[in-house]
Amino acid sequence: MNSEKQSRQWAHGADMVVGQLEAQGVKQVFGI
């Protein structure tokens, strides 16, 4: 397995999740 590629995919997914949370205004809840 190419762990480097897997890590990049995970990081990209995390960025998408954070973007969605921010779009929903959840970032205020977490105080980010």
Curated annotation (Swiss-Prot):
Top-level taxon in the UniProt lineage: Bacteria
Disulfide bond positions: none
Pathways involved: Polyol metabolism; (R,R)-butane-2,3-diol biosynthesis; (R,R)-butane-2,3-diol from pyruvate: step 1/3
Reaction(s) the record says it catalyses: 2 pyruvate + H(+) = (2S)-2-acetolactate + CO2
GO molecular function: acetolactate synthase activity
Protein's UniProt keywords contain Transferase: yes
Keywords from the UniProt entry: Transferase
EC number: 2.2.1.6
Enzyme class of the recorded protein, top EC level: transferase
Stated family: Belongs to the TPP enzyme family.
Subunit details: Homodimer.
Any further remark recorded for this protein: Does not seem to require thiamine pyrophosphate.
Protein name (Swiss-Prot/TrEMBL): Acetolactate synthase, catabolic
